[in-house]
């Protein structure tokens, strides 16, 4: 099954300026992500960036670059620009791999592509079980609840589902009903084209989660439990030091 990986790599970052180019053990972070994507068996890998320095680093590593505008409001909008520039057919399977995930396992890149290809749905993603209270109550860990067929009912920064009886006794432990969403998505190119025609939803603005736009407009997102748990992503200088140590 063929699929394309697109890696959005926006240069500007409030907490970590020039994030795609930060050095991790002798290589720019974006090159580590590119290498993980190559291991997935993708037919084509494209780094979508708004900065010439990022483009040069990717091309020096033998990667393909698509220059995009700097004013996109979301990663999906950046994907849509690449879809149009590359003239992908509507049924092309595209996996969006975040440019700040240098430890992402290649197996889950392939997994999300396979899951999408096996279903008549426009979008698929992954999640992992939550086993500790700290993560369950952390608003930076996005939770997802599913229906009986594995489709998302809702994504939230809140603790969902709320375990009424357990939490009435205390908030120290959690059961087996919590899933943390992973920021990796598979789409069909035609779905991306439709997504960017929709107005942002109120829920999307409240939670600051762009995938809620899909549910708002009545579309389905399939969610599978990831075969592997990805390593730390890089959002802050502290994350960067942790990743450097783990990848040493």
From Swiss-Prot:
Record-annotated membrane-spanning stretches: none
Cofactor entry: Mg(2+)
GO biological process, one term: lipopolysaccharide biosynthetic process
Reaction(s) catalysed by this chain's protein: 3-deoxy-alpha-D-manno-oct-2-ulosonate + CTP = CMP-3-deoxy-beta-D-manno-octulosonate + diphosphate
One Pfam family linked to the record: CTP_transf_3
SUPFAM superfamilies xref list: Nucleotide-diphospho-sugar transferases (SSF53448)
UniProt KW keywords: Cytoplasm, Lipopolysaccharide biosynthesis, Magnesium, Nucleotidyltransferase, Transferase
UniProt-annotated location(s): Cytoplasm
Family (UniProt): Belongs to the KdsB family.
Main function: Activates KDO (a required 8-carbon sugar) for incorporation into bacterial lipopolysaccharide in Gram-negative bacteria.
Protein name from the UniProt record: 3-deoxy-manno-octulosonate cytidylyltransferase
Species, as recorded: Escherichia coli O157:H7
